[in-house]
Amino acid sequence: MNRLYSIILLLVFICTHVHSQQAYFVDGYHGGIYGHYPVKWKTQFIVDQLSKHPDWRICLEIEPETWDTVQIQTPEAYRQLKNIVVSKQVEFTNPTYAQPYCYNISGESIIRQFQYGIAKINKHFPGVTFTTYSVEEPCFTSCLPQILKLFGFKYAVLKCPNTCWGGYTNAYGGELVNWVGPDGTPILTVPRYACEKLEENSTWQTTAWCNEESYLNACRDAGIEHPVGMCFQDAGWKNGPWLGSGKNIKSNSIYVTWKDYFENISIGKTNDEIGRA
């Protein structure tokens, strides 16, 4: 009887442990009319892929002026997209007008990037809100916590795992940190984890770019309860869900938006800090 009881307890522990180690992934697109956004087909492609894969979630980092051209050249796809972007499948995570790297321009210029970009996006998609700042390229600078909070953002992400050739943040912390600006303003942030190493034999990636088991195991060993990877695909690529779909999703990952991850999945708060001078 004691042996049977021990086996049952072991099975319960294993099931609980496996459940707590669910992997998550934030997919999306980045680009724009001046970089890479094939206007003739891209918007309809996004709409069709979201319809085909109802469990897919994406974050959009598209130069706001792009939508002026999309509205003119592919009006039907534009109309369909307007309905989808206010659904739980989509989150806009970088509304800056031209996706600046931020660390090489002044604070006033950064503010204008957000101001003009948000106004343009709201003109096209009035129901869109801006909750999380997340980028594919390393568009970070120390004053962002204050600026983001002033524009109504609640969260930030310091990962850029598939575009490290432009730069990358220091590896620090666990599931969440408070990113603190020079003025003392904090913003709840998903960092580049301390266990998130640079990818071997690559000059542009960290291990978080595709939810490999080695990355997820490192996260679990580091005590990260809800490990998450990300990749915002180039808008010029004709590719849907980055990790696959249905029963073929890599590492049994679940697609989420960053807003959903912060508010419904992550540990929600932390006392750990990064960035305070």
Q: Which residue ranges define each predicted feature?
A:
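Conserved S/T- and glycine-rich ATP-binding loop of Class I adenylate-forming
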Residues: 1, 10, 276
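Basic/polar N-terminal segments that are highly enriched at the extreme N-terminus
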Residues: 1, 18-20
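Sec-dependent N-terminal signal peptides
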Residues: 4-16
